[in-house]
Amino acid sequence: MAVGDAPLEKVALETYVPPAKPSLIGLSRAEISERLAAIGVAPAQRRMRVQQLWHWMYVRGAKTVGEMTNVSKDMRAELEKHVTVDRPEVVAEQISNDGTRKWLLRLPSGNTLEKPHEVECVYIPETDRGTLCVSSQVGCTLNCSFCHTGTQRLVRNLTAGEIVGQIMVARDRLNDWADRETPHGNRLVTNIVMMGMGEPLYNFDAVRDALLIVADNEGIGISKRRITLSTSGVVPNIVRTGEEIGVMLAISLHAVRDELRNELVPLNRKYPIAELMQACRDYPAASNAKRITFEYVMLKGVNDSLDDAKLLVKLLKGIHAKINLIPFNPWPGTRYECSDWEQIEKFSEYVFNAGYSSPVRTPRGRDILAACGQLKSETEKLSARERQALRAMAMTD
């Protein structure tokens, strides 16, 4: 199929079917109150009960209703008949040589006729922070040609509970809840990036609801300035992101000419660069203190020339921006190569001298296929030959 004929977006194969006993994870306070009303909790008690449940779920990380010891025994028994506080199940964990962790998570579902679906979630520890890369879809709506996830079919959108559940799983695995000890007394998951599997702005409502729960000061409590949502450029929902969520914004740009971006990010044929840049200028939360990050994967001989760097600087005029240069992370079957390090440095230096911060992202988790652009759920397993190719790539980098 020619590049110009490739579909801009994939259609989801399925819709979400909840388990017989749904989880309270991902519900708003109002929705939890409705669940309590449905099982007969008196109106005068609901507000207090909601706060108790919220605290146990998002501050103390309770895995069962039975752990909630300040909720009456009778109330716990009634709740356990109807709801859970389940999160996704960890079915595999890989730990990279650099400390990066990747979890393969199986999603609970009420659809017993289908194979359970899985997504990947990645934890990246650094000296001053711990970043969790979270998925928003099973597969991805888009067909970005340099991205491994883009080769996977779109199965369905994740629910708010499945998105929040990834953060809760990470805190479970790292023992990172408020009443538990962590090294040096610091929280281990300090930053969230919506840069995992999927296009977040094609699952706007669930992503919004999940991130508002994550940022809630009476629960998980991660500041909106430490949450970054990355989009390939779903222009109509960019301003909504600033107005309704208010988190940091990242744009997967990767090219400065429409002709090339049409190939790398086919969504560009629907929302071309000029429209995308205007949406960024209109982004409500942008300021010099809250700059928009432009992600730019460095592809050898494709988008890494100094002419590209010059055009990038022109495009960013009038936008509070920083540029994150990403060395291409190889995956089996890709036709792209990473730019030479010398060329990456030249590109970065030009952009920096033009007045924009332009750090080069350190690749993390390449050896476990956890780096940027490498995620692909185990529902589409790599063959033995592909795994051998991956190991060879990691050894040569």
From Swiss-Prot:
SMART domains in alphabetical order: Elp3 (SM00729)
Keyword entries, A-Z: 4Fe-4S, Cytoplasm, Disulfide bond, Iron, Iron-sulfur, Metal-binding, Methyltransferase, rRNA processing, S-adenosyl-L-methionine, Transferase, tRNA processing
Superkingdom to which the source organism belongs: Bacteria
Chain ranges of the Radical SAM core domain: 126-369
Reaction catalyzed: adenosine(2503) in 23S rRNA + 2 reduced [2Fe-2S]-[ferredoxin] + 2 S-adenosyl-L-methionine = 2-methyladenosine(2503) in 23S rRNA + 5'-deoxyadenosine + L-methionine + 2 oxidized [2Fe-2S]-[ferredoxin] + S-adenosyl-L-homocysteine; adenosine(37) in tRNA + 2 reduced [2Fe-2S]-[ferredoxin] + 2 S-adenosyl-L-methionine = 2-methyladenosine(37) in tRNA + 5'-deoxyadenosine + L-methionine + 2 oxidized [2Fe-2S]-[ferredoxin] + S-adenosyl-L-homocysteine
Residue positions of the active site: 120, 372
CDD domains tied to this protein: Radical_SAM (cd01335)
GO molecular-function term, one example from the UniProt record: tRNA binding
Cofactor-binding details, from the entry: Binds 1 [4Fe-4S] cluster. The cluster is coordinated with 3 cysteines and an exchangeable S-adenosyl-L-methionine.
Subcellular location(s) of the protein: Cytoplasm
Family annotation (SUPFAM superfamilies): Radical SAM enzymes
Bridged cysteine pairs (disulfide): 133-372
Cofactor(s) this protein requires: [4Fe-4S] cluster
Residues that, per the record, bind [4Fe-4S] cluster: 140, 144, 147
Gene Ontology BP annotations: rRNA base methylation; tRNA methylation
InterPro entries from the UniProt entry: Aldolase_TIM, Elp3/MiaA/NifB-like_rSAM, Methyltransferase_A, RlmN_N, RNA_MTrfase_RlmN, rRNA_lsu_MTrfase_RlmN/Cfr, rSAM
Job description of the protein: Specifically methylates position 2 of adenine 2503 in 23S rRNA and position 2 of adenine 37 in tRNAs. m2A2503 modification seems to play a crucial role in the proofreading step occurring at the peptidyl transferase center and thus would serve to optimize ribosomal fidelity.
Further comment found in the protein's record: Reaction proceeds by a ping-pong mechanism involving intermediate methylation of a conserved cysteine residue.
HAMAP family in alphabetical order: RNA_methyltr_RlmN (MF_01849)
Family note: Belongs to the radical SAM superfamily. RlmN family.
The protein's name in its UniProt record: Dual-specificity RNA methyltransferase RlmN
Native organism: Nitrobacter hamburgensis (strain DSM 10229 / NCIMB 13809 / X14)
Upper lineage: Bacteria, Pseudomonadati, Pseudomonadota, Alphaproteobacteria, Hyphomicrobiales
Gene name linked to the record: rlmN
